[in-house]
UniProtKB/Swiss-Prot annotation:
Function: Ligates lysine onto the cytidine present at position 34 of the AUA codon-specific tRNA(Ile) that contains the anticodon CAU, in an ATP-dependent manner. Cytidine is converted to lysidine, thus changing the amino acid specificity of the tRNA from methionine to isoleucine.
Name of the protein described by the UniProt record: tRNA(Ile)-lysidine synthase
InterPro entries: Rossmann-like_a/b/a_fold, TilS/TtcA_N, tRNA_Ile_lys_synt, tRNA_Ile_lys_synt_N, tRNA_Ile_lys_synt_subst-bd
Cell compartment(s), UniProt: Cytoplasm
Highest taxon in the source lineage: Bacteria
Family recorded in the similarity comment: Belongs to the tRNA(Ile)-lysidine synthase family.
Binding site for ATP: 50-55
Enzyme class: ligase
Gene: tilS
CC terms in the record's Gene Ontology section: cytoplasm
Chief localisation class: cytoplasm
Organism the protein comes from: Bifidobacterium animalis subsp. lactis (strain AD011)
Catalytic activity of the protein: cytidine(34) in tRNA(Ile2) + L-lysine + ATP = lysidine(34) in tRNA(Ile2) + AMP + diphosphate + H(+)
Domain notes: The N-terminal region contains the highly conserved SGGXDS motif, predicted to be a P-loop motif involved in ATP binding.
Keyword entries, A-Z: ATP-binding, Cytoplasm, Ligase, Nucleotide-binding, tRNA processing
Amino acid sequence: MAYSAAMKAAIGEMRDVLKAHGLGQQSKEFSAHGEHKPHDDAPFVFVACSGGRDSLALAACAQVVCAAWGIRCGAIIVDHHLQDASHKVAQQTAQTCRDLGLEPVLIVDVQVKERGQGIEAAAREARYAALVGTARRWHATAVLLAHTKDDQAESILIDLIRAAGTDAFAGMPQTQLFDDVLVLRPLLGITRAQTTRICEDEGLEYWDDPTNGDAVPLETALPASYPLRSRVRHDLMPYLSAFAGCDMVDRLARTARIARRDVEALNQEAERALAQTVEFEGNMRDLQADRLADDKLGANIDARALERWPEAIRYRVIARTLAACGLAYASRHVAAVDKLVSQWHGQGKVALPSKYSAKRKAHVIRICEDITHANRRCAKRN
């Protein structure tokens, strides 16, 4: 079958990413022409599909590659129930995925609970939980997400707007582990224009989320009520490209690839330093593990040992420690704890979120729930 240039590019990206994770051709029999059915024990991947142009292009591309390589490929459609048409969109998307040949195709209903982080973040949290939970139940090898080069560039700008730091320039990683489930982003080298072309060439009818602002003319700025990502896409990115006289999507995506290498090297060093300088107390499984609300975690930092590491590594170790304790920390909290490490002169404790504190005694910095608050909580429970 002859594929368009956009589809060929996406297939190439998909092959590279799958092969890099041991998901290459499963048997020589799949090199021969003709239709072949994956073996029952073949690796199994899920495509996360919303019905939008990016995820339908991903589904079509994944099915082509997986069918050719003997890999089982299914789809997960998450219905957030945030819009009136969500049920209809989910059903139509499921049928499109079945028509493409994906099996099984699952619709997963979720309840989005907004707890102060914003509805967009709450929906993302619910979606990832549903994808990871479903993948675990089906023993899937990986979940494929449809983030594109455009999404990568937009993510960098969003992270820079919301926070500062090296990690903001690294964007989204191509590979992530969520609760031991492998999550892959095979289309980070593919543009939204290419996914649109794939859908058009393959005759795939996609759905545009109205909150994306696609129906609003480019010369009209989106109101502040639209999600930040939509406003960055619709307003900021075109302005930056016009101002710079170049394709800022491509420029930012290339920046992300370079910065990602640096960030991963820093993270590896930080993990080594963490293992050597921090001891956790409580039910600690790993830094991404979910804990019960009353399952409080504390940590002891060997300040003398940590002081020997460069500042960039110290900050990452402290940030990981605070995150592992379940604290919604800010950069000022990390800096304040680092002063207990590198500028120690007998100062008092550092107040942290969630009624936690960091206090140094001799060479040990103890991070734990403030004793007064802990006593009150225990009294209420009893």
